[in-house]
């Protein structure tokens, strides 16, 4: 017969959630710091290319969405 698992205590769940949230905050701070450095030009460890000189044209042959009924595979 199936036996339900033990419930995790509220304090343990809160503790684990706090660890997750702390890591998220740390990553967010790093991202904001990097963005500030890039916008301010205060970084020399990252090479930023100026972007393409000619605009990139979309591929006209690329199909989007579903195929027409006549071109669908029959299974």
UniProtKB/Swiss-Prot annotation:
Protein name: Large ribosomal subunit protein bL32c
GO biological process: translation
Main location: plastid
Subcellular location: Plastid, Chloroplast
Organism expressing this protein natively: Nephroselmis olivacea (Green alga)
The entry's keywords: Chloroplast, Plastid, Ribonucleoprotein, Ribosomal protein
Gene Ontology CC terms, in alphabetical order: chloroplast; large ribosomal subunit
Basic residues bias (residue ranges): 59-75
Chain segments carrying region Disordered: 49-75
Keyword field contains Ribonucleoprotein: yes
Family: Belongs to the bacterial ribosomal protein bL32 family.
């Amino acid at each position: 017969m199936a036996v339900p698992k033990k419930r995790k205590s509220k304090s343990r769940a809160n503790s684990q959630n706090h660890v997750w949230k702390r890591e998220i905050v740390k990553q967010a701070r790093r991202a904001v710091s990097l963005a500030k450095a890039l916008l301010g030009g205060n970084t020399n460890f990252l090479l930023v290319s100026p972007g393409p000189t000619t605009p990139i044209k979309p591929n006209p042959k690329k199909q989007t969405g579903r195929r027409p009924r006549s071109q669908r595979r029959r299974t």
